[in-house]
């Protein structure tokens, strides 16, 4: 209905790639019990269900043998809405060691771990009526 507008404004906006910069760094603790073939993963994930499925797939374990615990997270702002590689590595190391492994990423590693929001161009056309 832009044809009926009294004022039309069209503009293109460019947004650079954005990396999430939440205060809380990425961290995970995984504990493997070899005698029971069970894994418990504590992670800052925002998607424990997806992490659970991905751990089972990556480790080749039955999902019933994996437990994911998601503590209170101070804020991920979209950074943790998918399983991240450090969570898989922590779990794999715990299983290989037959015990417990803790991983905490540095700020630089947090930026490298997640792809962030991609560079975007938005073309917008607005029609305003008096």
Give the predicted meaning of each segment.
Residues 1-130:
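Structural alpha/beta core scaffold segments of enzyme domains
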């Amino acid at each position: 209905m832009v044809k009926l507008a009294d004022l039309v404004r069209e503009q293109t906006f460019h947004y650079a790639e954005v990396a999430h910069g939440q205060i809380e760094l990425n961290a995970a603790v995984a504990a493997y019990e070899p005698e029971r073939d069970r894994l418990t993963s504590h992670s800052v994930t925002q998607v424990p269900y997806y992490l659970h499925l991905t751990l089972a797939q990556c480790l080749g374990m039955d999902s019933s043998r994996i437990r994911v615990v998601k503590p209170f997270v101070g804020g991920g702002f979209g950074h943790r809405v998918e399983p991240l590689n450090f969570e898989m590595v922590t779990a794999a190391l715990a299983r290989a060691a037959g015990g417990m492994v803790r991983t905490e990423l540095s700020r630089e590693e947090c930026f490298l771990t997640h792809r962030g929001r991609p560079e975007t161009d938005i073309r917008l056309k607005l029609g305003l009526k008096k």
